[in-house]
Amino acid sequence: FGDYFPKKFGMSQTTRDKILKTTFLLLLEKGYDRVLVSDIQDRLGISRGLMYRYFKGKSELFFEACRKYFYDKFFPELDYDKITLAEFFRNAEKAVGSMTNIDGEEVDILKYNTLYSAMIQCEPKFKREAQAEFDKARKVIRNAIKRGEIKKLPENFIGATILAIFGRTSYITQTPSNSYVCKRILEDIDQFYRLIRRK
């Protein structure tokens, strides 16, 4: 299907991957509730029939695109039973750097997090996926408390604080640069770990 796509996408990606990437970038650009299937078709220059060879409908397409770019692409398989909270944070910090650049296209981290929130609110299947991922993080927190890596604080408090740091969607006073937001996220998670770590 190479002739269906502009050369900027390169030939190394599969047709399905191109559709997922374009869908995700459009969701970031326009917002969850403003992207139409026709927008994706127009951006790629493909027929609706070709898209439906890969996805049953719009909901499945959005789910698959978001699962890939929120989880599969940035979080490798980790042993959540053995990993320390410090190691978990290091993996998350690497992911923040990767998330802000998708194949050469800069991604606004605040829009990225806003889309994540919208998907959780509007797509039950994605909400279940997010809950499963959060349960893995809670396991890491629970084990970190048991092992004495961090102070004995409520799991929910630690988890909610981590989500608040990584998942910020706006700044009250002004919208800072993308690099500043990423820098603050990494600094804040480091400071938080220092606060909860047992001496």
Where are these regions (language model features)?
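Amphipathic alpha-helical segments used for helix-helix packing
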Residues: 100-124
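Helix-turn-helix
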Residues: 18, 26-60, 64
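N-terminal intrinsically disordered/low-complexity leader segments
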Residues: 1-13
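C-terminal peripheral helix-coil segments that are non-catalytic and often amphipathic
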Residues: 1-4, 90, 94-98, 135-147, ...
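Hydrophobic alpha-helical segments that form the core
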Residues: 151-172, 184-191
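Generic hydrophobic, amphipathic alpha-helix propensity
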Residues: 15-23, 40, 65-69, 73, ...
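Hydrophobic alpha-helical connector segments
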Residues: 64, 77-106, 158-162
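Amphipathic alpha-helical packing segments from all-alpha helical-bundle domains
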Residues: 78-79, 121-149, 160, 190
